[in-house]
Amino acid sequence: MPGTKNDKPATEIAVAALLFDMDGTLVDSAAAVHSMYRRWAAKHGIGLESLMRVQHGRRSIEIATLYAHLGYDVAAETAWMVEQERTDPSPIVEVPGAAALLRSLPPERWAVVTSADRVLALRRLRAAGLPLPGVLVTADDVARGKPDPECFLMGAARLGFPAAECLVLEDAPAGLAGGQAAGAKVLALSTTLTPDELAPLPHVPDYRGVTACFEAGQVILRIAG
């Protein structure tokens, strides 16, 4: 019937490569992240609500630095946060459709660019049953975390493409800003922010309506209407 949602045409995005964030973009790790920050906030008398507003998509060291006026040792607190996340027993699952999408992509045309450390990133990707990337950029690899574009520029370079020819897939404001600062196209996941909060950026709730093919040297991402 004309005018219904099903009549909306599909959107196609053609790029050389895809740069995926991990937490909230490929895996749902919200329970583990919230559990760690709840304990850390209680430990230092920090308001949990305000902490959760600023932490998403950023490295542990940057969050520890943000509250360094409380007088603790930043390196020690960063190590505590990392260890708590590594050992948290909360389940880690894929964002719906993520595994199927990744398996449909040429392995040399996608990377994971995450604010997690390498040990945690590999652990979560495996726990969610996702294929491991050939290129993995983590908190260990960069001097400046998101929203600085360094990580996305590095991911694109390791794949062999300019960032301007890549698509960044992200759910967090810091990551979306970093992708844009790198000069990449961006596609947001509405797993953290609402569609209204993400507008006017293109966004999807998950990957169940997203397919990919490889044609004429380009990854063609097709988003159902």
Language-model features: locations:
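Asp-based, Mg2+/Mn2+-dependent phosphohydrolase catalytic module
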Residues: 2-16, 99, 109, 118-225
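N-terminal helical cap/lid subdomain that shapes the substrate entry/recognition surface
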Residues: 8, 12-106, 117-119, 130
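Residue-level marker of regulatory loop/turn positions in helix-turn-helix DNA-binding domains and
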Residues: 94, 113, 144
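Hydrophobic residues in well-ordered beta-strands that form the structural core
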Residues: 28, 112-114, 188
